[in-house]
Amino acid sequence: MKFSLSVALSLAAATAQAATQFCDQWGSVTEGNYILYNNLWGQAQATSGSQCTTFESLSGNTIVWNTKWSWSGGQGQVKSFANAALQFTPKKLSSVKSIDSTWTWNYSGSNIVADVAYDMFLSTSPGGDHNYEIMVWLGALGGAGPISSTGSPIATPTVAGIKFNLYLGPNGSMQVYSFVAQSTTKSFSGDMRDFFTYLEGNQGLSSDLYLVDVQAGTEPFSGSNAVFTVSDYSVSVA
């Protein structure tokens, strides 16, 4: 059987885009501008469970992936954070013009307690320790709740056209701001820079801080036969 050059190239491209699954605690794969992590950082809190993450495809700057898990025990404790992390050069917030992103996702399974969130970190220097964590929860499923010093929101802002409850609390030496959508948002398109602009104008966040990490994924607390599907995710820092 003869193959044309175009067919051969198509097969090569298909091979390069073949799905890649990994189930180890710190498993990851690099695709385009993203590192996709399994990141079972809290698995020791579970009495039983497992999780596997799969890279499906990359088209331009849009990544498609999923993670499947079952976790029990360790009530109220996060077991993992499977996520797509953007590779970029850290920039001062004052120099960040936009963080454009799109995200379409879905969840299935039994008794799911989990969040679906952007997780972004700020530091006083490009390579320094994280000083602030900014989370944007598009979904708080099954009663999942954010870090909070009081258990109550400190504000109820509307950002990127979505109404949020804003919480504040410590995570070690970091201060964590969590924007939790009042209604689950399974399809998002907007500029994540707007969240920092809000914090600068209303919570005194310094624009001299460096944006050092932009991640997006899911934090499971408990549930079984869970399938978290990301059918469209992209983000870029400009």
From Swiss-Prot:
A single GO cellular-component term from the record reads: extracellular region
GO annotation terms (biological process): cell wall organization; polysaccharide catabolic process
Q: Which cysteines are joined by disulfide bonds?
A: none
Q: What are the subcellular locations of this protein?
A: Secreted
Q: Which reaction does it catalyse?
A: xyloglucan + H2O = xyloglucan oligosaccharides
Q: Signal peptide location in the record? A: 1-18
Q: What is its main location?
A: secreted
Q: Is the keyword Glycoprotein assigned to this protein? A: yes
Q: Which organism is it from?
A: Neosartorya fischeri (strain ATCC 1020 / DSM 3700 / CBS 544.65 / FGSC A1164 / JCM 1740 / NRRL 181 / WB 181)
Q: Which keywords appear in this protein's UniProt record, sorted alphabetically?
A: Carbohydrate metabolism, Cell wall biogenesis/degradation, Glycoprotein, Glycosidase, Hydrolase, Polysaccharide degradation, Secreted, Signal
PANTHER family tied to this protein = BLR1656 PROTEIN, XYLOGLUCAN-SPECIFIC ENDO-BETA-1,4-GLUCANASE A
State which Enzyme Commission number(s) the record gives. Answer: 3.2.1.151
State one molecular function term (GO): xyloglucan-specific endo-beta-1,4-glucanase activity
Give the family from UniProt. Belongs to the glycosyl hydrolase 12 (cellulase H) family.
Name one matching Pfam family. Answer: Glyco_hydro_12
**Protein biosynthesis in keyword set:** no
The record's function comment reads: Catalyzes endohydrolysis of 1,4-beta-D-glucosidic linkages in xyloglucan with retention of the beta-configuration of the glycosyl residues. Specific for xyloglucan and does not hydrolyze other cell wall components.
Residues with attached carbohydrate: N106, N171
Q: Which domain of life is it from?
A: Eukaryota
Q: What class of enzyme is it?
A: hydrolase
Name of the featured protein: Probable xyloglucan-specific endo-beta-1,4-glucanase A
Q: Which residues cross the membrane?
A: none
Q: Which InterPro entries match?
A: ConA-like_dom_sf (IPR013320), GH11/12 (IPR013319), GH12 (IPR002594)
